[in-house]
Amino acid sequence: MINTQNFIYTAETTPDLSTNLSNSVSKIDPLVGLADAVNITDSPNCNTKLSSILSAAEIKKKGLDVILQLTGRDRNRIALESEMLGALSIDVNK
Protein backbone atom coordinates (compact mmCIF):
# COMPACT_ATOMS: atom_id res chain seq x y z
CA MET A 1 0.00 0.00 0.00
CA ILE A 2 1.31 3.43 -0.90
CA ASN A 3 2.41 5.54 2.07
CA THR A 4 0.96 9.00 1.50
CA GLN A 5 3.50 10.65 3.82
CA ASN A 6 6.39 10.20 1.39
CA PHE A 7 7.15 10.99 -2.23
CA ILE A 8 6.16 8.05 -4.41
CA TYR A 9 7.77 6.68 -7.56
CA THR A 10 5.57 5.40 -10.35
CA ALA A 11 6.21 3.92 -13.76
CA GLU A 12 3.92 3.45 -16.72
CA THR A 13 3.37 0.39 -18.87
CA THR A 14 1.19 -0.41 -21.82
CA PRO A 15 -0.09 -3.97 -22.21
CA ASP A 16 0.97 -5.71 -25.42
CA LEU A 17 -1.17 -6.61 -28.40
CA SER A 18 -0.86 -10.27 -27.53
CA THR A 19 -2.63 -13.03 -25.68
CA ASN A 20 0.58 -13.89 -23.83
CA LEU A 21 -0.04 -12.24 -20.47
CA SER A 22 3.26 -13.29 -18.93
CA ASN A 23 5.28 -11.52 -21.65
CA SER A 24 3.28 -8.34 -21.20
CA VAL A 25 3.59 -8.34 -17.42
CA SER A 26 7.25 -9.39 -17.31
CA LYS A 27 8.19 -5.94 -18.63
CA ILE A 28 7.74 -4.56 -15.12
CA ASP A 29 9.94 -7.12 -13.33
CA PRO A 30 12.87 -4.66 -13.03
CA LEU A 31 10.55 -2.22 -11.22
CA VAL A 32 9.74 -4.53 -8.30
CA GLY A 33 11.40 -2.99 -5.26
CA LEU A 34 12.03 0.32 -7.06
CA ALA A 35 8.64 1.71 -8.05
CA ASP A 36 5.80 2.16 -5.60
CA ALA A 37 3.13 1.74 -8.25
CA VAL A 38 2.66 1.09 -11.95
CA ASN A 39 0.30 3.12 -14.11
CA ILE A 40 -1.37 0.83 -16.66
CA THR A 41 -2.64 2.49 -19.81
CA ASP A 42 -5.89 1.53 -21.51
CA SER A 43 -5.52 1.11 -25.28
CA PRO A 44 -3.54 4.32 -25.89
CA ASN A 45 -3.71 6.08 -29.27
CA CYS A 46 -6.83 4.08 -30.19
CA ASN A 47 -4.79 0.87 -30.51
CA THR A 48 -6.07 -2.51 -29.40
CA LYS A 49 -4.11 -3.91 -26.46
CA LEU A 50 -4.49 -6.63 -23.85
CA SER A 51 -6.96 -5.72 -21.10
CA SER A 52 -5.52 -3.19 -18.66
CA ILE A 53 -7.61 -4.74 -15.87
CA LEU A 54 -6.18 -8.20 -16.47
CA SER A 55 -2.67 -6.74 -16.63
CA ALA A 56 -3.28 -4.83 -13.39
CA ALA A 57 -4.37 -7.98 -11.58
CA GLU A 58 -1.20 -9.82 -12.65
CA ILE A 59 1.05 -6.89 -11.73
CA LYS A 60 -0.54 -6.72 -8.27
CA LYS A 61 0.49 -10.36 -7.76
CA LYS A 62 4.11 -9.18 -8.10
CA GLY A 63 3.66 -6.88 -5.11
CA LEU A 64 3.30 -3.54 -6.88
CA ASP A 65 0.37 -1.20 -6.45
CA VAL A 66 -1.40 -0.35 -9.68
CA ILE A 67 -2.94 2.81 -11.06
CA LEU A 68 -5.52 1.66 -13.56
CA GLN A 69 -6.60 3.82 -16.46
CA LEU A 70 -10.01 3.37 -18.02
CA THR A 71 -10.81 5.49 -21.06
CA GLY A 72 -14.33 6.51 -21.88
CA ARG A 73 -13.50 7.17 -25.52
CA ASP A 74 -14.80 3.84 -26.83
CA ARG A 75 -17.18 2.88 -24.01
CA ASN A 76 -20.56 4.03 -22.84
CA ARG A 77 -21.53 4.37 -19.18
CA ILE A 78 -22.70 0.77 -18.88
CA ALA A 79 -19.45 -0.56 -20.35
CA LEU A 80 -17.38 1.60 -17.97
CA GLU A 81 -19.42 0.45 -14.98
CA SER A 82 -18.94 -3.18 -16.06
CA GLU A 83 -15.17 -2.64 -16.33
CA MET A 84 -15.10 -1.11 -12.83
CA LEU A 85 -17.13 -3.99 -11.39
CA GLY A 86 -14.75 -6.44 -13.03
CA ALA A 87 -11.73 -4.64 -11.58
CA LEU A 88 -13.27 -4.63 -8.11
CA SER A 89 -14.16 -8.32 -8.34
CA ILE A 90 -10.49 -9.25 -8.86
CA ASP A 91 -9.27 -6.82 -6.17
CA VAL A 92 -7.89 -4.14 -8.49
CA ASN A 93 -9.23 -1.37 -6.29
CA LYS A 94 -6.33 0.11 -4.36
Describe the predicted segments one by one.
Residues 1-94:
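Domain-level signal for soluble alpha/beta catalytic cores
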